[in-house]
């Protein structure tokens, strides 16, 4: 039974004029209506956050001048409470964080420094690793060095330590580590195509972690990999853009669009990925062995859809339009894989991350 009223936490980028770092949306799953019911400040931006399984705490990356930090907010139902600083980082603010499967450590990826690491949920035992600047991608403007963009786990729903993947946009790689020691596994690595610039990885929910999707920011595509527990094998790569669309500017050096987030429906039968520039959501049907078939590319009202999330019940989608500083709710037609605006946009400074409670 899906509740008629649900709550969604929104992370806002640094530099917000109203100083808000987090907002809470109250959403109606039957009509799509949404409104802000809480705004939280006291820190500079929340680039990305994660919520623990018991929904007691929200862990976030925040900015402290030129350095980053990991903080924790207490949750009381849908209310965000007091913030506790857990750890200062020796580098800038992470662009992504996650929790280890046993929820004893916070993992993070720092884009510009090319650093990945973990820290205990009590702020102790900080471990970091600087990704190697080897074998850069072909895009000379975006792949000058290693760029850590995401951390994820081979067994995301497990209770053990798991093994951590780090998506490297600069080197077209996914590296793997022990999250407790940050020792790199030299026998396991995904090598994406040159110039693809991978951004985020996602396991197909119903695949027992045997199918992995990799959204390529620079290539505007989704790669599909089979995983047998020891090796990732490329099954295919599917474009996120319509045929004939030129993703390069007239100078041939600058991209006019780039991919961002990747999600699936709850049953894992539809995969969705967002285009920033060619502002849209690409929808794919999941076929045999997890291979993807493009169903539709739904154009959006706002600019630069950085992140998005389906409401519980999956009749509506909440999209964060970073460059038009707004949140827009869209009605989602699952059969046609289409989106239609539902209501007026909600003003919000550069929304970056959405999580429903």
Predicted regions: what is each one?
Residues 128-143, 189-190, 235-254, 346-357:
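Surface-exposed loop and turn segments in beta-propeller and other repeat-based domains
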Residues 39-43, 86-90, 140-143, 189-194, ...:
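Surface loop/turn motifs at the tips and blade-to-blade linkers of beta-strand repeat domains
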Residues 24-32, 73-79, 119-126, 177-183, ...:
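Short loop/turn segments immediately following beta-strands, especially the blade-tip
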